[in-house]
Amino acid sequence: FTIDEQLYETLANDQAFYLRAEPLRHPLIFYLGHTAVFYVNKLIVAKVIEERINPHYEALFSIGVDEMSWDDLNDDNYDWPSVAEVKAYRDQVRAMVDHVIETLPLALPIDWDNPFWAIMMGIEHSRIHLETSSVIIRRLPLDQVRPLPLWEICEESGVAPQNQLLSV
């Protein structure tokens, strides 16, 4: 949760969350909510929790896009909540996930029949979106982002190495 939120601190203002930097993706407000919703939805399916935190958000932020023409990217079809509301929701989800991690009996191995599998999926899913969201943020106009020490600019450059195919 923390590193996701630190990534979004690079946005200069709340309006940046609602810009569509990548035409085939939702605005960043979706991804801020999506990674938290993923935990809730997976923990419900795994029968680790029984009640949703915010059923409206858990529908709104559940399904992303696959860069296909039939994906719903019409902004008129979405009434995105405020950044503060989504952050408050994330805080609730984080408290619930922390409680699950602290109280759910851990049995090894963690495979897909293990309730902890949903937590592992949530962690992996968040890491994937950390990467994709960082790419979307890099496509924003420069006045919509700000530098932060955690996300230093890479000063290294050079010629790309020559790749070669290896026999397998």
Annotate each predicted stretch with a short phrase.
Residues E9, Q15-S69, L106-L166:
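Short, contiguous alpha-helical
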Residues I63-L108, W117-M121:
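Acidic/histidine-rich alpha-helical segments that form the ligand environment
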